[in-house]
Swiss-Prot record:
<dbReference type="GO" id="GO:0080008">
    <property type="term" value="C:Cul4-RING E3 ubiquitin ligase complex"/>
</dbReference>
<dbReference type="GO" id="GO:2000028">
    <property type="term" value="P:regulation of photoperiodism, flowering"/>
</dbReference>
<dbReference type="GO" id="GO:0030154">
    <property type="term" value="P:cell differentiation"/>
</dbReference>
<dbReference type="GO" id="GO:0009627">
    <property type="term" value="P:systemic acquired resistance"/>
</dbReference>
<keyword id="KW-0217">Developmental protein</keyword>
<keyword id="KW-0221">Differentiation</keyword>
<dbReference type="GO" id="GO:0005634">
    <property type="term" value="C:nucleus"/>
</dbReference>
<keyword id="KW-0539">Nucleus</keyword>
<dbReference type="GO" id="GO:0006281">
    <property type="term" value="P:DNA repair"/>
</dbReference>
<dbReference type="Pfam" id="PF12265">
    <property type="entry name" value="CAF1C_H4-bd"/>
</dbReference>
<feature type="short sequence motif" description="DWD box">
    <location>
        <begin position="308"/>
        <end position="323"/>
    </location>
</feature>
<dbReference type="GO" id="GO:0005829">
    <property type="term" value="C:cytosol"/>
</dbReference>
<dbReference type="InterPro" id="IPR036322">
    <property type="entry name" value="WD40_repeat_dom_sf"/>
</dbReference>
<keyword id="KW-0007">Acetylation</keyword>
<feature type="modified residue" description="N-acetylmethionine">
    <location>
        <position position="1"/>
    </location>
</feature>
<feature type="repeat" description="WD 5">
    <location>
        <begin position="335"/>
        <end position="375"/>
    </location>
</feature>
<keyword id="KW-0853">WD repeat</keyword>
Amino acid sequence: MESDEAAAVSPQATTPSGGTGASGPKKRGRKPKTKEDSQTPSSQQQSDVKMKESGKKTQQSPSVDEKYSQWKGLVPILYDWLANHNLVWPSLSCRWGPQLEQATYKNRQRLYLSEQTDGSVPNTLVIANCEVVKPRVAAAEHISQFNEEARSPFVKKYKTIIHPGEVNRIRELPQNSKIVATHTDSPDVLIWDVETQPNRHAVLGAANSRPDLILTGHQDNAEFALAMCPTEPFVLSGGKDKSVVLWSIQDHITTIGTDSKSSGSIIKQTGEGTDKNESPTVGPRGVYHGHEDTVEDVAFSPTSAQEFCSVGDDSCLILWDARTGTNPVTKVEKAHDADLHCVDWNPHDDNLILTGSADNTVRLFDRRKLTANGVGSPIYKFEGHKAAVLCVQWSPDKSSVFGSSAEDGLLNIWDYDRVSKKSDRAAKSPAGLFFQHAGHRDKVVDFHWNASDPWTIVSVSDDCETTGGGGTLQIWRMSDLIYRPEEEVVAELEKFKSHVMTCASKP
């Protein structure tokens, strides 16, 4: 039974004093820090102190707070809707779950996130209910009136799962988004049926929740690279053992029917307990070798469970086909000039693959233009970030649109179709970039397009550098005047032309 009276995510009652989360750089994230460490000045603060001590009048770029204030002032103009939710503990991943209810002015939907703690309370996988306001419903003057330190009334905790270790990645099964996979600092992938898992109280000393399945096969920690197949119940993972591992969980899911609301659940085993070791295990369907360093991300083809790709710290992009064996089909040796962090396969066009890297760029590859030995350049390089790119994802709403988030605190929205369109005006922004979400004040570690609600995105930032800890979750939708065809927008604005002109003529 869902309840809107449930406690909001990250209740203050279970957090340490000061509400700080974690620190110390971790690959694409970080480890929680001690309370003493939370008092250490951030790099921005240290830089400001050095500037004051030097006494030099050097022209500085706007500070994080100044940029944020500028952005917040533009929220009523740029956004159709925005909800800001303070996280006392940071979350390294965020994902949309199934839509629960549709109403006149808003929809209710599951949201998956996590709490990465310092050990004073357990690490958790959080299942929340989110109220998603429908387009053109929220008043412009209201969406920018939020307190950065407050929890959003649109996000309510529904259930807590005590996770064995911190949650680095969450991925939902497309055929049944009530089933999710998680990565932690271990070789295993954990599978959870979030609807049947009991709600737990996260207090120090509480036993871990018991995963419904454990996928084994890695020989070293597999921390981030994780994907679930859009066509079949297959799971893909990559890790420090330089391998890509494929599993099928078909035999462990009961299929009740074709209705998405009752599409199946994890087959339950007899016996009770919360010990992870009591959970049933599933061995790999295949183990694939070809990387020379840690595999950082993986993605399935949108049309086949047998085809997938991976990227890693060896700067390689590798395409695989399980039907041809365990060796790479195509290996792009120098896909970027640094470590690759993320990859996504276009769900509308299975020839297009996006990659993001520590070289601050996003690159677009067309697999038809790659030879078997990896010879072939990206068809475009998107340059708009000033720090390492952490996440890329194609939009479910338009085949040429995608998002990228980075350590510079920005979430950029791009349209590849706009790259080729020439403009008489001098380019003031990178080619293809048409929207920049600047609502986060620190690295944006993950985001997810909402397939049930067009142009709606959830994003999370890890705020250790700017606020000393914790994180920020934002749910937002840009104004449709930004992405709709120009002729449609002009026609709509013409209706208000006389009113605008009248207002402009007044003293």
